[in-house]
Amino acid sequence: MDDFDRDVDNELEFSAKSTKNIKVHATFESMNLKTDLLKGIYGYGFEAPSAIQSRAIMQIISGKDTIAQAQSGTGKTATFSIGMLEVIDTKSKDCQALILSPTRELAQQIQSVVKHLGDYMNVHTHACIGGTHVGEDIKKLQQGQQIVSGTPGRVVDMIKRRNLATRNIKMMILDEADELMTKGFKEQIYEIYRYLPPGVQVVVVSATLSREVLEVTGKFTTDPVKILVKRDDITLEGIKQYHIQCEKEDWKFDTLCDLYDSLTITQAVIFCNTKVKVNWLTDQMKKANFTVVAMHGDMKQDERDSIMNDFRTGNSRVLISTDVWARGIDVQQVSLVINYDLPTDKENYVHRIGRSGRFGRKGVAINLVTKEDVDELRDIERFYRIRIKEMPVNVNDIM
């Protein structure tokens, strides 16, 4: 199911200023959605709209530019997917909606959510991502895809090759907008936007919306509806957060080895800041006879797919990764996240540890810190208004 966690949802508080004129819909029926879409929503396992869904879906359907802020676990993917599916004309084969995501995995996952929600609607949707054969994209697009979910590089390439016609696109969705804007996709998004018809509806969805993102999206949007979460609710409830003080960087490895038995109780993700570090740590763990798998952005797509598949099915239990994994990928069993390195970008902290409390499961996040990292840890605490306690001696007490 989409990234929905009822505990997290119940904790959400929206900024009164941003939502005061927005009607809250307590049921999907009250939205007057197409019957086939409603069947897809219930078939997918939703019973009632989440907090963000009850506010944002109807704004999207009304055609207004919309900026919706909601963290992992709130059903935000389904929010824009439902809004989009309601306005799609299934009789036309033309591309009518374009979703842009910062990672291939997220683009594929969104396509899967759209497919499931649109199960009874005969909707054609395609994931247009790098790392796959261009010929396959061209073939699929020629067959007619009403919804395209993709990464900016491949999408702009398909538009320039004239394989993706933009004249009937009525909605552009930017998912994880903060990541799209800050990780070098800004120019490609501007370029894509220039190819779209004037007056195209823009929907911006993200867990964190910095002032910079709001300024940039201001260039695309006209008088947007803003549905914003209060800043102090942005960290995930239900995640216990700890730090372990390590005398020096080299000692982090021994600390991790001591924790390994606890890691494999369920499944764990270990985050490093660079692919070099991911490869180094993976080699060290394997040399010490620990079973781990690794993933980072430089791997070929089929290799990443295979690793993700093994991890999803539980064949592998410990994944070492860079932030490429931190956004939008659902693995239900993950209940422990270890930050071997603290994230260089404070806003990525919520994306990393947000993995571990999905689907109402309580999670644990452990941060390994040296003296040099202490200031960074304090910055994270201030940013999210949280306290990251020192880890108890017996790790099993917290699992």
Swiss-Prot record:
InterPro entries in UniProt: DEAD/DEAH_box_helicase_dom, Helicase_ATP-bd, Helicase_C-like, P-loop_NTPase, RNA-helicase_DEAD-box_CS, RNA_helicase_DEAD_Q_motif
Chain location of the short sequence motif DEAD box per the record: 175-178
One term of GO molecular function: RNA helicase activity
SMART domains the UniProt entry points to: DEXDc (SM00487), HELICc (SM00490)
EC class of the enzyme, as a word: hydrolase
EC number per UniProt: 3.6.4.13
Compartments where found: Nucleus, Nucleolus
Swiss-Prot/TrEMBL keywords: ATP-binding, Helicase, Hydrolase, Nucleotide-binding, Nucleus, Ribosome biogenesis, RNA-binding, rRNA processing
Domain of life the protein comes from: Eukaryota
One cellular component term from this protein's GO annotations in UniProt: FAL1-SGD1 complex
Segments forming domain Helicase ATP-binding: 57-227
Function of the molecule: ATP-dependent RNA helicase involved in 40S ribosomal subunit biogenesis. Required for the processing and cleavage of 35S pre-rRNA at sites A0, A1, and A2, leading to mature 18S rRNA.
Family, similarity comment: Belongs to the DEAD box helicase family. DDX48/FAL1 subfamily.
Name of this protein: ATP-dependent RNA helicase FAL1
Organism, as annotated: Debaryomyces hansenii (strain ATCC 36239 / CBS 767 / BCRC 21394 / JCM 1990 / NBRC 0083 / IGC 2968) (Yeast)
Organism lineage string: Eukaryota, Fungi, Dikarya, Ascomycota, Saccharomycotina
Gene: FAL1
